[in-house]
Amino acid sequence: TINLNRCIQYAVKNGMHYLTYLEEIVDLVHKVQTAYNENLKDLQAKGMLPLFDAGYINLARQYLTIGVNGLVEAAEFLGIPINDNDDYVDFVQGVLGLIERYNKKYRSKELMFNCEMIPAENVGVKHAKWDREDGYVVPRDCYNSYFYVVEDESLNVIDKFRLHGRRYIAHLTG
Protein backbone atom coordinates (compact mmCIF):
# COMPACT_ATOMS: atom_id res chain seq x y z
CA THR A 1 0.00 0.00 0.00
CA ILE A 2 1.37 3.38 -1.03
CA ASN A 3 1.09 6.01 1.69
CA LEU A 4 0.24 8.95 -0.55
CA ASN A 5 0.29 11.52 2.24
CA ARG A 6 3.84 10.60 3.23
CA CYS A 7 5.07 10.40 -0.36
CA ILE A 8 3.62 13.75 -1.35
CA GLN A 9 4.83 15.52 1.79
CA TYR A 10 8.30 14.01 1.33
CA ALA A 11 8.44 15.25 -2.27
CA VAL A 12 7.34 18.78 -1.35
CA LYS A 13 9.74 18.99 1.61
CA ASN A 14 12.59 17.90 -0.68
CA GLY A 15 11.79 20.36 -3.47
CA MET A 16 10.40 17.82 -5.94
CA HIS A 17 7.14 17.85 -7.81
CA TYR A 18 5.01 15.28 -6.05
CA LEU A 19 4.10 13.42 -9.27
CA THR A 20 7.78 13.05 -10.19
CA TYR A 21 8.57 11.48 -6.84
CA LEU A 22 5.40 9.42 -6.83
CA GLU A 23 6.34 8.04 -10.25
CA GLU A 24 9.57 6.63 -8.74
CA ILE A 25 7.60 5.04 -5.91
CA VAL A 26 4.93 3.59 -8.22
CA ASP A 27 7.60 2.11 -10.49
CA LEU A 28 9.34 0.56 -7.47
CA VAL A 29 6.07 -0.90 -6.17
CA HIS A 30 5.43 -2.52 -9.55
CA LYS A 31 8.91 -4.05 -9.47
CA VAL A 32 8.25 -5.39 -5.96
CA GLN A 33 4.89 -6.83 -7.02
CA THR A 34 6.52 -8.46 -10.06
CA ALA A 35 9.15 -10.05 -7.80
CA TYR A 36 6.40 -11.20 -5.42
CA ASN A 37 4.64 -12.86 -8.34
CA GLU A 38 7.86 -14.66 -9.31
CA ASN A 39 8.18 -15.84 -5.71
CA LEU A 40 4.65 -17.25 -5.88
CA LYS A 41 5.56 -19.13 -9.05
CA ASP A 42 8.60 -20.63 -7.33
CA LEU A 43 6.53 -21.64 -4.31
CA GLN A 44 3.90 -23.22 -6.53
CA ALA A 45 6.55 -25.12 -8.51
CA LYS A 46 7.74 -26.58 -5.19
CA GLY A 47 4.21 -27.67 -4.24
CA MET A 48 3.93 -25.16 -1.41
CA LEU A 49 0.67 -23.51 -2.50
CA PRO A 50 -2.04 -26.17 -2.20
CA LEU A 51 -4.92 -23.78 -2.93
CA PHE A 52 -3.24 -22.83 -6.20
CA ASP A 53 -2.55 -26.48 -7.03
CA ALA A 54 -6.17 -27.41 -6.28
CA GLY A 55 -7.38 -24.78 -8.74
CA TYR A 56 -8.98 -22.42 -6.22
CA ILE A 57 -6.56 -19.66 -7.17
CA ASN A 58 -5.18 -19.29 -10.69
CA LEU A 59 -1.87 -17.45 -10.64
CA ALA A 60 -2.29 -16.40 -14.27
CA ARG A 61 -5.57 -14.65 -13.43
CA GLN A 62 -4.50 -13.15 -10.11
CA TYR A 63 -4.34 -9.36 -9.95
CA LEU A 64 -1.42 -7.71 -8.20
CA THR A 65 -3.00 -4.84 -6.28
CA ILE A 66 -1.43 -1.42 -5.96
CA GLY A 67 -3.13 -0.14 -2.84
CA VAL A 68 -3.33 3.54 -1.95
CA ASN A 69 -4.11 5.30 1.30
CA GLY A 70 -3.86 8.93 2.47
CA LEU A 71 -5.15 10.53 -0.74
CA VAL A 72 -7.44 13.01 1.03
CA GLU A 73 -4.78 13.85 3.59
CA ALA A 74 -2.22 14.52 0.85
CA ALA A 75 -4.62 16.87 -0.93
CA GLU A 76 -5.28 18.66 2.36
CA PHE A 77 -1.52 19.08 2.87
CA LEU A 78 -1.28 20.69 -0.57
CA GLY A 79 -4.08 23.11 0.37
CA ILE A 80 -6.60 21.60 -2.03
CA PRO A 81 -10.18 21.90 -0.74
CA ILE A 82 -11.77 18.47 -0.29
CA ASN A 83 -15.02 18.97 -2.13
CA ASP A 84 -16.22 18.59 -5.71
CA ASN A 85 -13.96 21.12 -7.44
CA ASP A 86 -11.66 21.07 -10.47
CA ASP A 87 -8.42 21.34 -8.45
CA TYR A 88 -9.35 18.28 -6.41
CA VAL A 89 -10.43 16.37 -9.53
CA ASP A 90 -7.11 17.21 -11.21
CA PHE A 91 -5.18 16.07 -8.15
CA VAL A 92 -7.06 12.77 -7.81
CA GLN A 93 -6.89 12.03 -11.54
CA GLY A 94 -3.20 12.92 -11.64
CA VAL A 95 -2.26 10.60 -8.78
CA LEU A 96 -4.53 7.68 -9.66
CA GLY A 97 -3.95 8.14 -13.40
CA LEU A 98 -0.20 7.78 -12.83
CA ILE A 99 -0.75 4.45 -11.09
CA GLU A 100 -3.07 3.27 -13.86
CA ARG A 101 -0.46 4.13 -16.51
CA TYR A 102 2.10 2.01 -14.68
CA ASN A 103 -0.43 -0.80 -14.27
CA LYS A 104 -0.76 -0.85 -18.06
CA LYS A 105 2.99 -0.48 -18.61
CA TYR A 106 3.79 -3.54 -16.47
CA ARG A 107 0.89 -5.66 -17.67
CA SER A 108 1.85 -8.79 -19.61
CA LYS A 109 0.42 -12.21 -20.39
CA GLU A 110 1.49 -13.28 -16.92
CA LEU A 111 0.91 -10.08 -14.92
CA MET A 112 -2.22 -8.05 -14.26
CA PHE A 113 -2.38 -5.07 -11.92
CA ASN A 114 -5.21 -3.10 -10.35
CA CYS A 115 -5.46 -0.06 -8.09
CA GLU A 116 -7.60 0.10 -4.96
CA MET A 117 -8.27 2.53 -2.16
CA ILE A 118 -7.33 0.36 0.80
CA PRO A 119 -9.84 0.21 3.67
CA ALA A 120 -8.58 2.42 6.45
CA GLU A 121 -9.42 0.32 9.49
CA ASN A 122 -5.92 -1.08 9.84
CA VAL A 123 -3.38 0.51 7.54
CA GLY A 124 -4.95 3.98 7.78
CA VAL A 125 -4.35 4.03 11.53
CA LYS A 126 -0.78 2.76 11.14
CA HIS A 127 0.09 5.24 8.39
CA ALA A 128 -1.24 8.17 10.43
CA LYS A 129 0.60 7.01 13.56
CA TRP A 130 3.92 6.44 11.79
CA ASP A 131 3.68 9.70 9.85
CA ARG A 132 2.93 11.70 13.00
CA GLU A 133 5.90 10.05 14.77
CA ASP A 134 8.13 11.01 11.82
CA GLY A 135 7.04 14.66 11.84
CA TYR A 136 4.66 14.71 8.89
CA VAL A 137 1.42 16.72 8.92
CA VAL A 138 -1.32 14.35 10.05
CA PRO A 139 -4.81 15.89 10.30
CA ARG A 140 -6.52 12.86 11.89
CA ASP A 141 -5.74 9.58 13.64
CA CYS A 142 -6.83 7.44 10.69
CA TYR A 143 -6.31 8.11 7.00
CA ASN A 144 -9.63 7.44 5.41
CA SER A 145 -10.48 5.39 2.35
CA TYR A 146 -13.01 7.80 0.91
CA PHE A 147 -12.68 10.79 -1.39
CA TYR A 148 -13.97 13.14 1.29
CA VAL A 149 -13.16 14.02 4.89
CA VAL A 150 -15.40 11.74 6.92
CA GLU A 151 -15.88 14.21 9.76
CA ASP A 152 -16.77 17.11 7.41
CA GLU A 153 -20.35 17.93 8.37
CA SER A 154 -20.69 20.51 5.59
CA LEU A 155 -20.97 17.70 3.01
CA ASN A 156 -24.38 16.21 2.42
CA VAL A 157 -25.17 12.78 0.95
CA ILE A 158 -25.31 14.16 -2.60
CA ASP A 159 -21.85 15.74 -2.16
CA LYS A 160 -20.48 12.41 -0.98
CA PHE A 161 -21.96 10.62 -3.99
CA ARG A 162 -20.42 13.21 -6.30
CA LEU A 163 -17.05 12.70 -4.63
CA HIS A 164 -17.29 9.01 -5.52
CA GLY A 165 -18.46 9.67 -9.08
CA ARG A 166 -16.74 8.90 -12.36
CA ARG A 167 -14.40 11.91 -12.23
CA TYR A 168 -12.86 10.57 -9.03
CA ILE A 169 -12.96 6.80 -9.41
CA ALA A 170 -12.11 6.57 -13.13
CA HIS A 171 -8.61 5.23 -12.44
CA LEU A 172 -9.53 2.80 -9.65
CA THR A 173 -9.71 -0.70 -11.08
CA GLY A 174 -9.97 -2.92 -8.02
Residue ranges of predicted features:
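Flexible helix-coil linker/hinge segments at domain or subdomain boundaries
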Residues: 32-41, 100-110
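Structured mid-domain segments that build the active-site/substrate or prosthetic-cofactor binding neighborhood
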Residues: 1-69, 73-76
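Short secondary-structure subsegments characteristic of cysteine-rich extracellular domains
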Residues: 84-103
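Modules that initiate DNA replication and primer synthesis
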Residues: 55-62, 73-76, 80-82, 100-101, ...
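Catalytic alpha/beta core of large soluble enzyme barrels
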Residues: 122-125, 132-174
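A glycine-rich phosphate-binding loop feature that marks nucleotide/adenosyl-phosphate handling sites
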Residues: 42-56, 96, 109-129
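Short intrinsically disordered, low-complexity coil segments enriched in acidic
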Residues: 1-6, 68, 115, 168-174
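Flexible loop/turn segments at secondary-structure boundaries
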Residues: 8-12, 80-81, 121-126
